[in-house]
UniProtKB/Swiss-Prot annotation:
Catalyzed reaction equations: a lipid A disaccharide + ATP = a lipid IVA + ADP + H(+)
Protein name per UniProt: Tetraacyldisaccharide 4'-kinase
Keywords, ordered alphabetically: ATP-binding, Kinase, Lipid A biosynthesis, Lipid biosynthesis, Lipid metabolism, Nucleotide-binding, Transferase
Naturally occurring in which organism (per UniProt): Allorhizobium ampelinum (strain ATCC BAA-846 / DSM 112012 / S4)
GO annotation (BP), single: lipid A biosynthetic process
GO molecular function, one term: tetraacyldisaccharide 4'-kinase activity
InterPro entries assigned: LpxK (IPR003758), P-loop_NTPase (IPR027417)
Pathway: Glycolipid biosynthesis; lipid IV(A) biosynthesis; lipid IV(A) from (3R)-3-hydroxytetradecanoyl-[acyl-carrier-protein] and UDP-N-acetyl-alpha-D-glucosamine: step 6/6
Membership in a protein family: Belongs to the LpxK family.
EC number(s) stated in the UniProt entry for this protein: 2.7.1.130
Pfam families the record matches: LpxK (PF02606)
Length: 345
């Protein structure tokens, strides 16, 4: 099923949002109580959590990858902790990209595991224990800011500068995962991604509370020249428009754009339609690294696996990385987590 955030989430207060406000009030109370929980498991190593205040994508995974690479450069042994959204694995599992597929562990853990050991678990505290057994000396949580299952030494909250906090309402009336007040109490640093101005109110709120505000940009890695190419762009991510914006910046002519739900496996029919439409209109197929991970997951069983691999072979994959405006930021984040961990012992 295709799931995208409703448009009224990103508009001023509207009738649908106001009609849903009573449900949002209840959801917000529950979410705030959960975030105030005091029974968090305290791992024997520092923990950095990469989260966001809203539902959907903001750049958490690229941020987590950037921090892990910085940790490796510092001589540390980082490991990722994920719930493996979209996968079937529930017990703590060390991700093996050569064995597991997106159907098993989700798409994002496959990307994370290409850089550092990655454990998926339905219960984050169990996953943290598994990472400790693996000899990890720094845990990086991809999401989980609102869960309060694990003691966090440094919480970096990522926000999209083009969307900010939307209409400011908690789900389902808006995109917020919990009331902003409790989220800002718990975060340590606010990371604003991009050059938009929708996050300015959040930046001001953070400044009033003395929260450091970091800035960064998503940049595509070097790849094939797309300038002037007529493309069919397809993406099953939380914010396909972000991907399309990157393609336009690379000079691609997006003739057809096909958006699918975040973490949504492509059906055999959808795969066939993409291939056939691109061939009929003489378009180049272009997709994201997350979609590449899902398509690779079709290599084992399931209808249409041959077409899935055909689609992947015909697609140009655009990989991105998080570039901090201040290159020293990743090391500072890691240092803060280590310092707070030592003080808590």
């Amino acid at each position: 099923m295709k799931l995208h955030a409703p448009s009224f989430w990103w508009q001023k207060a509207s009738f649908p949002a106001l009609a849903l406000w009573p449900l949002s009030f209840l959801y917000g109370r529950i979410a705030a109580r959960r975030m105030r929980g005091s029974s968090a498991y305290a791992p024997a190593v520092p923990v950095i959590c990469i989260g966001n205040v809203t539902l959907g994508g903001a750049g958490k995974t690229p941020t987590a990858l950037a921090l892990a690479k910085a940790a490796l450069a510092m001589g540390l042994k980082p490991g990722f902790l994920s719930r493996g959204y979209g996968g079937t694995v529930r017990r703590p599992t060390l991700v093996d990209p050569g064995h597991h597929t997106a159907k098993d562990v989700g798409d994002e853990p496959l990307l994370l595991a290409s850089v550092a050991p990655t454990v998926v678990a339905s219960r984050r505290r169990d996953g943290a224990r598994e990472l400790e057994r693996q000899g990890i000396d720094l845990i990086i949580m991809d999401d989980g800011f609102q869960s309060a299952q694990i003691r966090i030494d440094c919480a970096v909250v990522v926000t999209d500068s083009y969307k900010g906090d939307g209409n400011g309402f908690v789900f389902p009336a808006g995109p917020l995962r919990a009331p902003l007040a409790i989220q800002f109490q718990k975060l340590d640093m606010l990371l604003v991604v991009g050059k938009g101005d929708a996050a300015i109110p959040m930046v001001r709120r953070g400044a009033r509370m003395g929260k450091p505000v970091l800035t960064a940009q998503l940049h595509p890695l070097p790849g094939p020249n797309l300038r002037g190419q007529r493309v069919l762009a397809y993406a099953g991510i939380a914010d396909p428009e972000k991907f399309y914006r990157t393609l336009r910046e690379l000079g691609a002519d997006i003739v057809v754009a096909r958006g699918f739900g975040d973490h949504q496996p492509l059906s055999a029919a959808a795969i066939a339609e993409l291939i056939e439409e691109a061939e009929a209109k003489n378009l180049s197929l272009v997709t994201t690294a997350k979609d590449q991970a899902r398509l690779r997951g079709s290599r084992r069983g399931g209808a249409g696996q041959d077409r899935a691999q055909e689609l992947l072979a015909k697609s140009t994959v655009i990989e991105i990385e998080m570039i901090f405006d201040d290159p020293a930021v990743p090391a500072r984040v890691i240092d803060q987590a280590q310092d707070r961990f030592r003080r808590s012992r």
